[in-house]
């Protein structure tokens, strides 16, 4: 769990472990009702995904999620593919191409892989993004003056989900003369399943 000291500051043990290892796992931050809300809303969004990459309609013939957006929202992959690995995407941060097993013949030609900009489609995702305890952790790591700026949902369905190799996020400040361990910010990763 997230632990705060008597002054309301994030436990120093947590900050020290994060500094030493580069990650920290919080468990039971989101309550079961919050997780259920996330799962339900994600499934509702999925029913409104386009029928195929670049499609404007969902399987029910309605305008697809993000069809009216200028920026890309849904990234697709071939089933069990690794579209990022070994590529120049994101400044080449996914350095290794993962093995791409052959998917079952019954799988669809394309699988949803990444949903970008979920906050514009989901009240529940917005609530998680603004979760008071998570914002307190962000403040403890980044200081009071920080700006959350990105959200990405990776979709990994059984039997068709794409692979993502180990990588370090942040790709713009590694060579900075003012480099410090917090220069690239950090991520929260909420696991829905």
PLM features: residue spans?
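Non-heme Fe(II)-dependent double-stranded beta-helix
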Residues: 1-20, 27-181
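Short gly/pro-enriched beta-turn/loop segments at secondary-structure junctions
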Residues: 159, 185-189
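Short, intrinsically disordered, charge-balanced linker/junction segments flanking boundaries
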Residues: 191-193
